[in-house]
C-alpha cells in the first residue's frame, strides 16, 4: 500500500500522463486544517479535488485505478458539463458588483483560526468570529467563496458594510427543524416541518436544529438577534445553544437542562468523535436569556476567567473582548444534524485570486450588529 505522499504524487503523475494539466496546492480550511488538493492549471476557476479524502478511501480498500478513472472522468466532465461551464465563466467582479450582493455571514472559532482571521474582514462574537462569504447560487453555481481582506478592499466594502448587507440577506434565510425528525430524514429537509414557517414549536420538540435553507454555513444565524428573540418567544422560555458545527446550531429549552456542563460535555465528546475537524465551531455552550434579550457563554467558570463584560449597545468594536452581548431593547454524528457524505460533495473551486469556492454536488445515482 502506498503512503500518502506516494499516493498524491502518483495520482497527479497518472493524470498528467492521461493529458490533464494538473498540479497540487495546499488549501487552508477552517480551524487550521490544511489539505492538499488537485487543481487544473491555467484556469480562472478550477475544481479542487481534496486528496486526504481520496487517500482515506484508498486506505479503507478502494481500488486505486478505479479512483484514478473516477477523477479522470470528473476532470473531463469539467470541460463539457453545463454546471462547470457556469463555474468557468464565473467572475467575482460580476458577483461583487451586482445590485443585490449575495453576501452572508458565518461563525468560526476565534482561537482555532487566529492566522486565517488575519486575512479576512471579521468581528468578534463571544468566543467566535463572524466572517463573510458570497453565495454563488444566483449565478448558476451551487457554491460559496469566503470574502478576504483583499477582496473587500478591491470592491470598496468595509466590514461594517459587509455586516449590514449580510444581516439583510440573512433575515429570511433561517430554518428550524426538530432534531429527531432531521436525523430520521437523513438531512432531507423537504420532508421536515419548519417551525419558523408554522410560527410554533411543539412541546414534543426537545432539541431542534437552527440552520439555513441549504444547511450550509448556517452558524451565522446566531448573530441575528431578532431571530433568537422570535424563537425564545415561541418557546416561552430561555434556551441553550449548542454549536453543532459551522453549518448548524442545536437549540434546547433551558428548563430541560439542570446543568449546562452536561451539554458542554456532550459538545466535547461529539466534536472529538463525530464532527470533522474543519467543521467544528467551538466547545462552548451558549445561553439566550429571553427577558434580557442577551446571548452569553453558559459556563460561568469560563466567563469569570475571561472577565465577563456586558454591553447595552449592539454597536460593539471588533477588537472588544466580549463574553456577553446585550441586545438593544428597542429592537423588536449524534446530537448534530446528519453529517455530509464527502462522496456527495463537489470539490471546491478557486479563481485567479486564489479564493476558495466550495460547493455541493447533488447525490449521484449508483446578524445582529454587534
Regions inferred by a protein language model and the residue ranges of each:
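Terminal alpha-helical anchor/extension segments at protein ends
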Residues: 1-17, 187, 191-219, 273, ...
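N-terminal, positively charged regions that mediate nucleic acid binding
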Residues: 2-23, 31-35, 39-41
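Short amphipathic alpha-helix segments
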Residues: 9, 219-233
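A short linear hydrophobic-aromatic micro-motif
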Residues: 22-24, 237-241
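Charged, alpha-helical interface segments at or near domain boundaries
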Residues: 24-209
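C-terminal structured domain segments
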Residues: 244-281
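TerminUS-proximal long segments
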Residues: 268-306
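Non-Sec secretion/translocation targeting segments of pathogen effectors
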Residues: 314-370
Amino acid at each position: 500500500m502506498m503512503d500518502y505522499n506516494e499516493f498524491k504524487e502518483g495520482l497527479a503523475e497518472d493524470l498528467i500522463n492521461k493529458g490533464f494539466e494538473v498540479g497540487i496546492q495546499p488549501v487552508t480550511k477552517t480551524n487550521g486544517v490544511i489539505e492538499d488538493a488537485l487543481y487544473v492549471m491555467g484556469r480562472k476557476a478550477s475544481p479542487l479535488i481534496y486528496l486526504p479524502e481520496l487517500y482515506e478511501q484508498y486506505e479503507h480498500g478502494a481500488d486505486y485505478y478505479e479512483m484514478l478513472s473516477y477523477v479522470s472522468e470528473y476532470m473531463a466532465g469539467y470541460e463539457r458539463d453545463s454546471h462547470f461551464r457556469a463555474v468557468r465563466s464565473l467572475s467575482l467582479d460580476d458577483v461583487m458588483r451586482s445590485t443585490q450582493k449575495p453576501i452572508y455571514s458565518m461563525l468560526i472559532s476565534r482561537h482555532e483560526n487566529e492566522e486565517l482571521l488575519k486575512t479576512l474582514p471579521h468581528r468578534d462574537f463571544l468566543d467566535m468570529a463572524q466572517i463573510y462569504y458570497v453565495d454563488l447560487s444566483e449565478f448558476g453555481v451551487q457554491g460559496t467563496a469566503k470574502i478576504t481582506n483583499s477582496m473587500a478592499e478591491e470592491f470598496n466594502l468595509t466590514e461594517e458594510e459587509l455586516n449590514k448587507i449580510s444581516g439583510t440577506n440573512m433575515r429570511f434565510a433561517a430554518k428550524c427543524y426538530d432534531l429527531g425528525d432531521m436525523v430520521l430524514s437523513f438531512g432531507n429537509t423537504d420532508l421536515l416541518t419548519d417551525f419558523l414557517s408554522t410560527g410554533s414549536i411543539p412541546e414534543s420538540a426537545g432539541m431542534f436544529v437552527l440552520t439555513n435553507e441549504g444547511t450550509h454555513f448556517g452558524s451565522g444565524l446566531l448573530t441575528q438577534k431578532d431571530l433568537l428573540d422570535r424563537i425564545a418567544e415561541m418557546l416561552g422560555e430561555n434556551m441553550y445553544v449548542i454549536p453543532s458545527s459551522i453549518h448548524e446550531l442545536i437549540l434546547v429549552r433551558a428548563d430541560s437542562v439542570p446543568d449546562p456542563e452536561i451539554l458542554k460535555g456532550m459538545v466535547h465528546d461529539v466534536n472529538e468523535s463525530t464532527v470533522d475537524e474543519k467543521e467544528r465551531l467551538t466547545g462552548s455552550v451558549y445561553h439566550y436569556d429571553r427577558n434580557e434579550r442577551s446571548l452569553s457563554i453558559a459556563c460561568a467558570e469560563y466567563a469569570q476567567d475571561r472577565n465577563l463584560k456586558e454591553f447595552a449597545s449592539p454597536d460593539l468594536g471588533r477588537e472588544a473582548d466580549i463574553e456577553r452581548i446585550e441586545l438593544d431593547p428597542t429592537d423588536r454524528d449524534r446530537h448534530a444534524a446528519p453529517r455530509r457524505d464527502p462522496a456527495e460533495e463537489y470539490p471546491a473551486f478557486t479563481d485567479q485570486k486564489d479564493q476558495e469556492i466550495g460547493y455541493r454536488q447533488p447525490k449521484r445515482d449508483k446578524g445582529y450588529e454587534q
